[in-house]
């Protein structure tokens, strides 16, 4: 059976450190604050939101929600972003993505003040992540993947890694970050001819396809480390599933993250870390 790479120990250690840094900022009269912008009521967004609110409370970050209907107009959403930009009491902004059809996500991303972009939404932050240059923050989930691997001592230097998914939110950023750590990375996607073979050849698989159970038993082998980034709500089952078929993979692989309880727990801690760092930069 696979070793379960649980996110709680990683998040707990980060939270303790961040709470001390947050308390020091509060003593200086600065209360770290995060604005969470949610459009609609997707279950995966709601799950992330609940986790983010709990993490902020534990660290001492003031979190405020900006809740907009799924049929919000582009102008209304942009106005909400501009309000956040103009509010000096807000140090970071988290916008749940993807946005509903009809909204221009690129225009919204470009409108956010890069200094408040704690999840690599703006072009400037994304450039930092992909190039390794600049001061922008990496996507929280991508950074959480590396934090988990580091915590459990998974060797990346020279390792073969298959990243399943090429979105700008997770896939491409985490591939770039792994490459910067000297891993040999293969990015897989919908046009990959033999996904299972590419995954089996890897030492580490990062599943970020955004589709439940994309990685089945034919795509894994003994000794592998499998990081499941997926958060997929199954209406019929009434629960969350990852991108990996957990029940099929667990008896085979060497180590595996659960969903929930894996990457997601660390992601909220990284989000809090970015908010604290944004404040520390602002008050230097």
Predicted regions, residues:
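Glycine-rich phosphate/diphosphate-binding loop of Rossmann-like nucleotide-binding domains
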Residues: 39-53, 136-225, 229, 234-250
